Amino acid sequence: MLEQINSPYDLKKLDIKDLPRLSEEIRQFIVEKVSKTGGHLASNLGIVELTLALHYVFNSPVDKIIWDVGHQCYVHKMITGRRDKFDTLRQFNGLSGYTKRTESIHDIFGAGHSSTSLSAALGIATARDLKGEKYHVIAVIGDGALTGGMALEALNNIGRSRKDVIVILNHNEMSISENVGSLSLYLSKLRTDPTYNKVKQEIDNLLNIIPPIGKSLHKYIEKIKDSIKQLVVPGMFFEELGFTYLGPIDGHNVEELIEVLERSKKMKGPLLIHVVTKKGKGYMFAEKRPDKFHSAAPFDIETGKFVGEGKDSYSDVFGKTLAEMALKDEKIVAITAAMPEGTGLIHFAKLIPDRFFDVGIAEQHATTFAAGLAVEGYKPYFAVYSTFLQRAYDQVIHDVCIQKLPVVFAVDRAGIVGEDGETHQGVFDISFLRAIPNIAIMSPKDANELVEMVKLSRNLDFPVAIRYPRGKAGEYDISRKPSFPLGKGEVLLEGEKIAVFALGRMVSKSIDAAEILKGHGINPFVVNLRFVKPLDEELILEISNKVDLVVTVEDNVIAGGVGSAILELLNDKKVYRPVLRLGFPDKFIEHGDVESLFKKYGLDSQSIADTILQRYKEMRGS
């Protein structure tokens, strides 16, 4: 049946009775494809019926369906003509794992970060009304994303606007008992009936025109009605914001979903439809551990085991090191914004739960929460992906750095992350953090250096950012102690004529590039910078004065990066040397495997060597 579906129009040809069977085919397809490519499995398995119902009832792309975060869009992509591209999901030059406006007219709004859909939906609905057009605007948002402050701001604004916006709350974490669910479903059916709403309004009008008893009676009835609703309707919060609340609805009963969505099309004003789904539905391992299969690496379908499972990542190295430190130091606390597994803080959470804080999708709050802890003498470590730290930039400046509070930002997924693409590449953090006074920025060349930097940060009494990449870490010794002070780099290879200053994971690539250059008779210095701020100015100036060409290599955009910092230093100190800065260009970096992206942008070892060799030859006129 799935083979027949290449557009929403094809889906609408099916009988409703056929949709449950189609749902199962889709789940099998998703498990098979994601097991090979990796991707967001659990959330997509949980939203199959809801996606089918949305495309069955509404007319995309005339009606605008907006997916919050975008990672649960696989079924949407299949229905809208991209099923044949799923072998390339998240691969270099392949299908994006998120909604992307350049990929399809059905992807109304691009996403990757959470809590943005409601604001976008209100903007689109407002534009619709200003232009005098007629179509439906639907935003699909999960209960996790609803914890984001931006989503709550938008809910407040939508309710106040009274505009026709349909919000689908995909509630996939809590089961709702059957009696409450049945009662709520009954109330939803009643309240979605246009006849009921018309009668309700007529009764309200009638009560209001009987003075003075009418008004007081109306008030009394409203009090009774509100009291009853508080007892039996879980959506009172949304009602108070100005929404008509419908639900909860069984998110895996496609016929009920279609019925409610059809009724909702006829209603006016802001609507919130509460849909209950199960993450990972249909695949046993994902149902048991939806957190593990949220963003999954390739895996074995039969066993549920991931390819390469068992090796520690940089996140694990950080998490285990911090947990070991905290066992001996009661002032250390750990904070995550809904990413305990991804950031490696799960190790800390298990050992020291009373000093572990998961604040939900709330990076702004997490940062200022950390600042408050620091004011009272604690040492907070906020582990956050580089791309999500962007969301707390004002708090980093205003609440942490201006007050010079000793908060440590463990900046995970720094640099290129690969398959998640433009919205997740961590290639801006050096640039946006380097401009802020009072903060130290460091980046380890390997896992052992990460252990040392985490321990070094403990006794620094000002803000610190430690940036490290996604990926496996290699061997490391968690008992290591810091072997270098703040702001001190190291010379890894002595050389002549050319100096290569590298940061973080680009150090190993620079060493490999130096070996290639030796084959051309060139022996460059290779320096592990370790620190972006403060720079090891003494070492940089000493080496730069010995060479004809200075090269910087970083896993960050060139604009404002560590190469810019070194160029500024040399200029200020009147050391006039040509500086070749290698990093990412002034563009958003697409999705693909990390090594393919490094090669495309000239940051693999061979490309680094080739670029240096070419520039050196140009300088010599040969």
UniProtKB/Swiss-Prot annotation:
Keywords carried by this UniProt record: Isoprene biosynthesis, Magnesium, Metal-binding, Thiamine biosynthesis, Thiamine pyrophosphate, Transferase
Superkingdom of origin organism: Bacteria
EC number(s) from the headed UniProt entry: 2.2.1.7
Pathway assigned to this chain's UniProt record: Metabolic intermediate biosynthesis; 1-deoxy-D-xylulose 5-phosphate biosynthesis; 1-deoxy-D-xylulose 5-phosphate from D-glyceraldehyde 3-phosphate and pyruvate: step 1/1
GO biological process: 1-deoxy-D-xylulose 5-phosphate biosynthetic process; isopentenyl diphosphate biosynthetic process, methylerythritol 4-phosphate pathway; terpenoid biosynthetic process; thiamine biosynthetic process
GO cellular component, one term: cytosol
Entry cofactors: Mg(2+); thiamine diphosphate
Binding site for Mg(2+): D143, N172
A Pfam family that the UniProt record links to this protein: Transketolase_C
Keyword ATP-binding (UniProt): no
Cofactor: how and how many bound: Binds 1 Mg(2+) ion per subunit.
Residues at which thiamine diphosphate binds: H71, G112, H113, S114, G144, A145, N172, Y283, E363
Catalytic EC class: transferase
InterPro entries in the record: Dxylulose-5-P_synthase, THDP-binding, Transketo_C/PFOR_II, Transketolase-like_Pyr-bd, Transketolase_BS, Transketolase_C, Transketolase_CS
Gene Ontology molecular function, alphabetical: 1-deoxy-D-xylulose-5-phosphate synthase activity; magnesium ion binding; thiamine pyrophosphate binding
Catalytic activity of the protein: D-glyceraldehyde 3-phosphate + pyruvate + H(+) = 1-deoxy-D-xylulose 5-phosphate + CO2
Function comment: Catalyzes the acyloin condensation reaction between C atoms 2 and 3 of pyruvate and glyceraldehyde 3-phosphate to yield 1-deoxy-D-xylulose-5-phosphate (DXP).
Quaternary organization: Homodimer.
Family (UniProt): Belongs to the transketolase family. DXPS subfamily.
Protein name per its UniProtKB record: 1-deoxy-D-xylulose-5-phosphate synthase
Native organism taxonomy: Bacteria, Bacillati, Bacillota, Clostridia, Thermoanaerobacterales
